[in-house]
């Protein structure tokens, strides 16, 4: 087997592994499907509920971050007009020491 054949075989194996892992991740855990959860013990139901809540939290955080990013992009024109200099006065610089 030449190096080129070995390289192609390795690349093909990596692609197949990536595709199979992606499909498994998209399907989600089989134990937390709605028809099966009712038959599970209470502690498993709590775990499934926690997983569902974490998914909801993740989607809420993603939407919040996207909204904040879009607000920053919308305000970027104002920042560019002022050349990134601050216009509000919320601090004062005091200098102590000898006069020159």
From Swiss-Prot:
Record's signal peptide: 1-24
GO molecular function (one): neuropeptide hormone activity
Keyword presence, Calcium: no
UniProt entry keywords in alphabetical sequence: Amidation, Cleavage on pair of basic residues, Neuropeptide, Secreted, Signal
Keyword set includes DNA damage: no
Listed GO CC annotations: extracellular space
Biological processes, Gene Ontology terms: adult locomotory behavior; negative regulation of digestive system process; negative regulation of heart contraction; negative regulation of heart rate; negative regulation of smooth muscle contraction; neuropeptide signaling pathway
Propeptide: 25-84
Compartments, record wording: Secreted
Chain positions with Phenylalanine amide modification: 96
The family this protein is said to belong to: Belongs to the myosuppressin family.
Role played: Myoinhibiting neuropeptide.
Protein's name according to its UniProt entry: Dromyosuppressin
Gene encoding the protein: Ms
């Amino acid at each position: 087997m030449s190096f080129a054949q070995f390289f192609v075989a390795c690349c093909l194996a990596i692609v197949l592994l990536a595709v199979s892992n992606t499909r498994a991740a998209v399907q989600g855990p089989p134990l937390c499907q709605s028809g099966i959860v009712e038959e599970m013990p209470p502690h498993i139901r709590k775990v499934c509920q926690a997983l569902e809540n974490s998914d909801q939290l993740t989607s809420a955080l993603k939407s919040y971050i996207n909204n904040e990013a879009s607000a920053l992009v919308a305000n970027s024109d104002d920042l560019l007009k002022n050349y990134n200099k601050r216009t509000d006065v919320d601090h004062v610089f005091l200098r102590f020491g000898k006069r020159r």
